[in-house]
């Protein structure tokens, strides 16, 4: 029986928190920032928690946490 492999693309994007939830960074915060408002850029700095609809798929991609 082969080992279960972690999806490396997902591993780079999602991190498991201490409480078992998964956090990720929002998109659109790396370049072309001059036309974005300060409020929008400030909200993009915050990490987000995976929603219930995506949680099952992320757990499948990251079997080892």
Curated annotation (Swiss-Prot):
One of its GO terms (biological process) is translation. Keywords: Ribonucleoprotein, Ribosomal protein. Pfam families: Ribosomal_L35p. GO terms for cellular component: cytosolic large ribosomal subunit. One of its GO terms (molecular function) is structural constituent of ribosome. It comes from the Bacteria. HAMAP family: Ribosomal_bL35. Belongs to the bacterial ribosomal protein bL35 family. This is Large ribosomal subunit protein bL35. It comes from Desulforapulum autotrophicum (strain ATCC 43914 / DSM 3382 / VKM B-1955 / HRM2) (Desulfobacterium autotrophicum). The gene is rpmI.
